[in-house]
Amino acid sequence: MTDANEITHALRLWFQVGDVFEVRVLDAVSADYRREHIESGYFDYEHISAVPEALKRLLSFRGVYVTVNPVNPDLLARAVNRLRPAGRNPTTADTDIVRRRWLLIDCDPKRASGVSSTKAEHESALAKARKIRSDLFSLGWPDPIMTDSGNGAQLMYRIDLPATDGGLVQKCTNAFARASDDAVSIEWLWRPARSTATN
């Protein structure tokens, strides 16, 4: 997703007033740094519109990822509402997450790393995500946000738990790991600092 309105809309769905989050950009190339590298920056909710503006200064990049759980507001000082080459600078760790707001389920076709999915593989992943959504809905789960990554699909369930939840989210993700099959890999992303693509 590179459209400014779509990025802003997604971030406003994921975060709320007072939140701080990290944006990470893979294989970025800028006028100042011509080799592919990772860019990282911290943004607060009040400056969400600065994210697409920061992306505009990059000449190219492969993907944009965001920590969907809010981080310690002190981390904003690392790169205030801007991107910078990550280099040896620290990025978000699990201990930097202040609250769990999302449970992520990633459905991707099984394929070699770096290879895009075929149309049939992509549809298979979308069908698997729809099936999981339907199964969980029948168990009383709410409707998730479902996103299409272009290769697969991701389900995002709103939760409200402390960052250190005693392993509750991990236990939940382990219980549903059986949904993987020969064609589609299901990854329940339980680590609190896990990021997701902005597609």
Predicted regions and their residues:
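Signature for HUH/AEP ssDNA processing cores
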Residues: 1-151, 158-181
